[in-house]
Curated annotation (Swiss-Prot):
Family membership noted in the UniProt record: Belongs to the scoloptoxin-10 family.
Signal peptide per UniProt: 1-23
Modified how: Contains 3 disulfide bonds.
Intracellular or extracellular location(s): Secreted
Keywords: Disulfide bond, Secreted, Signal, Toxin
Tissue: Expressed by the venom gland.
An example Gene Ontology CC term for this record: extracellular region
GO molecular function, one term: toxin activity
Protein name, per record: U-scoloptoxin(10)-Sa2a
């Protein structure tokens, strides 16, 4: 019985790893134009400070990822992740993916 349980959980674990590897992630999606503009503004506001640039870009990436799950998280979710907002606003429909 222990051997069969070990085999079962090994197969279950391998299935999980394969599905996780094959799953489409936010980083795999093309960046919409509005997100590219937000990145440019963040870099412009950092004024050449590499630490500030890194923080700003990480903040944008995290907000984009979180907006995929909850479109009402921040008011700019429609701009950061227009392809995943559950209720399609006019702004979201006009944005390019």
């Amino acid at each position: 019985m222990n051997k069969s349980m070990l085999i079962f959980f090994t197969i279950l674990f391998l299935t999980y790893i394969i599905e996780e590897k094959e799953a489409l992630k936010v980083e795999d999606l093309p960046e919409p134009e509005s997100y590219k503009r937000a990145k440019q503004l963040a870099l412009k506001d950092a004024k050449g400070d590499k630490n500030a640039e890194t923080i700003a870009l990480n903040f944008l990436k995290q907000n984009r990822r979180d907006c995929m799950k909850n479109c009402k998280l921040v008011p700019t979710c429609a701009l950061l992740s227009p392809e995943c907002c559950p209720d399609k606003t006019d702004v979201c429909k006009k944005l390019a993916l």
